[in-house]
């Protein structure tokens, strides 16, 4: 992403948000901890954050969101004109399938075994099953589903909590980075086809960010000061294949209006420094050595708008705002902006 583009992003970021009323009739979210807003709260899992200091800047306090405030789908929902946050599937009423649900689950991945060492999580396969059950029980019309906005952000854990974690996983010994990315894309293709069969036509597919630049990976796979090139290079292979998959869907699948969101370029720590952030490789909250989540009820940084990362893996609300607006306005999404998907 060029500096010129990010200068535009900075202007958009600081400008007042203008919303012209709800555009899409409903919004459905699938993914992992980047999008989870409470689905893991009652699971037997280490991947849940329904405690302080998470939600430090969120109106309702700790809700299960892996940030100090709003997540990317929260902000995209606001930009799309939704008056209320899309509820987590675990807490939603049946009729809310007409306006949207969030099925995302911290720790989830494309592969079923991903993050199994963390305990229970809702895989992307199960998330789609939950979606099918929800829209079927609520009898949501097919015509309405085709007008809804969909967002899916999955795959990070297949690298963080699988491929680059030697125990209890052996995928790195079995696959080269190219082979592994291809195996994930095969799974992804199947799930996107299933989502399309369930009525989805307007889907924002998020690529992976620069995982090698997260504080967790910088500590475990580098010297703690620079990004892990090995991890980022593996992610780039996956992203290229995912980008191609989205473009292929648009060409071959009837009615598909999928867009690819380039989180890798959009999540460049140097770009965030250029935007005015001051801390890119350190968490805002207190994280114990060898862990990734905030220590409960411990001090956090006062200048949260200057930090890219909230904990050792997840971004601050300020970062989420930049990414959400960049994808919504088409700065890091192609061939459509999410704004186009929401209103067409």
UniProtKB/Swiss-Prot annotation:
The protein's enzyme class: hydrolase
Entry annotated with the keyword Acetylation: no
Instruction: Using the UniProt annotation, give the residues that carry a glycan (glycosylation sites).
Output: 303
Per UniProt, the keywords (alphabetical) are: Glycoprotein, Hydrolase, Lipid degradation, Lipid metabolism, Secreted, Signal
Give me the Gene Ontology terms describing cellular component: extracellular region
Any GO molecular function: hydrolase activity, acting on ester bonds
**Which superkingdom does the taxonomy of this entry point to?**
Eukaryota
Q: Where is the active site?
A: 33, 311, 314
* InterPro entries, A to Z: GDSL (IPR001087), GDSL_esterase/lipase (IPR051238), SGNH_hydro_sf (IPR036514), SGNH_plant_lipase-like (IPR035669)
- EC number, UniProt record: 3.1.1.-
Keyword DNA-binding in annotation: no
Subcellular location(s) per record: Secreted
* Signal sequence region: 1-21
Give the UniProt record's GO annotations in the biological process aspect: lipid catabolic process
CDD domains reported in the protein's UniProt record: SGNH_plant_lipase_like (cd01837)
Q: Which SUPFAM superfamilies would you find in this protein's record? A: SGNH hydrolase
**Native species:** Arabidopsis thaliana (Mouse-ear cress)
Pfam families to which the protein is assigned, alphabetical: Lipase_GDSL (PF00657)
Report the SS bond pairs.
Answer: none
TM segment ranges: none
User: Can you say what this protein is called?
Assistant: GDSL esterase/lipase At2g19010
Q: Which family does it belong to?
A: Belongs to the 'GDSL' lipolytic enzyme family.
**Main localisation:** secreted
